A protein has these predicted regions:
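Bacterial Sec-dependent N-terminal signal peptides
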Residues: 1-31
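Glycoside hydrolase catalytic-domain context in secreted enzymes
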Residues: 22-575
Length: 575
């Protein structure tokens, strides 16, 4: 018994000595560990934190723990990372294990113009304002990583996701991405530039094997990513779904190690696109840091937490414990993740952020106004002269349809969205009568992953009936403004599908041509993130490229149409 007591006392003594060793000589306070000392260099903090972590804690840090979060190290007080979709606004909160809306009442955001519109401004100051505002909204919502911006090159006008990118010019994309990143990261939020690399179509995006020359790779498809790393200092990059030279981009040695790390000196985190990892050993050795996915709710894959079955989770741990791989690569991955955490969630000086503020709405409006493009103005039909106009006819579903919901991962739940019709009515006021006719019926749905627009766009009238009403309204108007184009439905401007053709859907060409016959002051406003065919171009005097403009869409379009703002945008891709 005495022997056991001695052993216990000896053990307690060692514990006491260990505890006392953590106390500083000055003032009797506990010494701050290096990794928690904000006065130490980040690399020192990373090294110290890494040295304190167990193998299991390290592996837990390199894969998802929910749809939009990854683990920290609770034992050491290192917080988890939270991410959000957000090319054009911070996405609504979703449930832990799926993408359905979580039904919060505090997650309505400002919707900013699509990045095609930002690129059309050709104004780096607008890119900085965009990044600063969206970064502030992400920070307020306690997001550490904003999964944006997208800089994939506009290679085909049929790519359903072109609206999320910055056009076909590598130089323009490289110029605009840098201030966007700086604006976001000033808020203590990491920009995550995507999709690296060569993800230029949605059709078969998971299986397409891209083959191209090095000259095309370096001169066309990589400049924006290189600028993001070397000039913008982006803290994270998202891998893409496709393959490059037979190897998936999310664990492609040429892209992630040879170019990104060795040539460009990237020191941030490579995040997989959701479900983009396919091979544990390639992910270990070829530069993937943090695996995310969408194939599990975390609960229904047997007795283990299903997230532990990710390629960089339990399978990785098993390989290490069996001695089949070492821990050098793991330490590199965890170091990158720790560096990101110290830059974001553990930065004590990060701002508080703000959400849905008037200033953010104003920034969105200014970006929209600078990005709107005047494609044609024969006979100086524009701007609308409110001193002469008595009646303005507004035609087209896109005059009333909300465009912030839908389109894939960029779908938003907004604080407000001003439609083109409401914006024009508000600006015109009592100076003229504004009369609306629908003209055509597109996609009546108004829901995406549980986020609802609240609009009921069902209309059982035939195409002929809708057209007849539009012509009746238009024939005696002083101006006719047709708001048409694309929307965020599948096979239009939408993730995970490409367009079926270059033409306008819903028989809009017929409506436009018939309107041109009854009124010579016809203005067509094309709302899209893509080029469209315009077989009626010689019939219509005025054409405006209106993009997807976000919360202030209607206000910005009205300002341009009546001449309050100059349509100074330039096309970032070929029409």
């Amino acid at each position: 018994m005495i022997s056991k007591i001695k052993k216990r006392l000896f053990g307690f003594g060692l514990y006491s000595v260990a505890c006392l060793s953590l106390f500083a000589q000055k003032g009797g306070r506990a010494a701050t560990p290096v990794y928690l000392d904000e006065n130490k260099a980040i690399e020192q903090r990373v090294e110290d934190a890494l040295s304190r972590m167990t193998l299991e804690e390290k592996v837990a840090m390199v894969h998802a723990q929910s749809n939009f979060s990854s683990a920290g190290c609770p034992r050491l007080g290192i917080p988890e990372l939270w991410m959000s979709d957000g090319p054009h606004g911070v996405r609504a909160e979703v449930l832990w294990g799926n993408f359905d809306w979580a039904n919060w009442t505090t997650d309505s955001c400002t919707a900013f113009p699509a990045l095609t519109c930002l690129a059309a401004s050709f104004n780096p100051d607008m890119a900085y304002a965009y990044g600063e505002a969206i970064g502030a909204e992400a920070r307020y919502r306690k997001k550490d990583v904003l999964l944006a911006p997208g800089v994939n090159i506009y290679r085909s006008p049929l790519n359903g996701r072109n609206f999320e990118y910055m056009g076909e010019d590598p130089y323009l994309s490289a110029t605009m991405v840098v201030p966007y990143i700086k604006g976001v990261q000033e808020n203590g939020v990491a920009a995550c530039v995507k999709h690296y690399a060569l993800n230029n179509q949605e059709f078969n995006r998971h299986t397409t094997n891209v083959q191209l020359s090095d000259r095309a790779l370096y001169e066309i498809y990589l400049p924006a990513f290189k600028a993001a790393v070397q000039e913008g200092g982006t803290w994270s990059i998202m891998g893409s779904y496709n393959l490059y030279q037979g190897q998936h981009a999310c664990h492609n040695k040429r892209l992630l190690k040879d170019i990104l790390r060795d040539e460009w000196g990237f020191d941030g985190v490579v995040v997989s696109d959701w479900g983009g990892v396919h091979n544990t050993e390639q992910a270990i050795h070829n530069g993937m840091d943090l695996e995310f996915g969408s194939w599990t709710n975390g609960l229904s894959a047997g007795t283990r937490n299903a997230y532990d079955n990710y390629f960089l989770a339990f399978p990785y741990l098993k390989l290490i414990k069996e001695g089949k791989v070492g821990t050098k690569e793991l330490d590199e991955k965890v170091s990158n993740v720790l560096r990101l955490i110290f830059r974001t969630s553990m930065d004590p000086h990060k701002p508080f952020g703000s959400l849905g503020s008037p200033e953010h709405g104003q920034a969105g409006r200014e970006i929209a106004e600078e990005g709107i493009v005047l494609l044609q103005n024969n006979g100086n039909v524009l701007p609308i002269d409110l001193n002469k106009a008595k009646k303005i006819a507004v035609i087209g579903e896109n005059a009333i349809k909300m465009m912030t919901v839908g389109g894939g991962s960029s779908s938003l739940k907004v604080k407000y969205e001003i439609s083109p019709l409401d914006g024009l009515k508000s600006r015109v006021g009592s100076k003229a009568e504004v009369v609306y006719a629908r003209g055509y019926v597109g996609d009546p749905t108004g829901e995406y992953n549980g986020v609802k627009t609240g609009q009921d766009l069902k209309d059982n009238r035939s195409e002929d009936e809708l057209l007849a009403e539009a012509l009746q309204v238009a024939k005696d108007a002083d101006y006719v403004v047709f708001f048409g184009g694309l929307n965020k439905s599948n096979h239009q401007d939408c993730e995970d599908s490409d367009r079926a053709s270059l033409g306008l859907p819903y028989a809009q060409d017929r409506v436009i041509s018939e309107l041109a016959k009854v009124n010579k002051n016809l203005i067509v406003v094309n709302i899209s993130g893509n080029a469209v065919a315009m077989p009626w171009v010689n019939e219509v005097p005025a054409i405006v490229q209106g993009w997807f403009l976000g919360s202030e869409a209607g206000t910005a379009l009205a300002s341009v149409l009546v001449g309050d703002a100059n349509p100074s945008g330039k096309l970032p891709f070929t029409f």
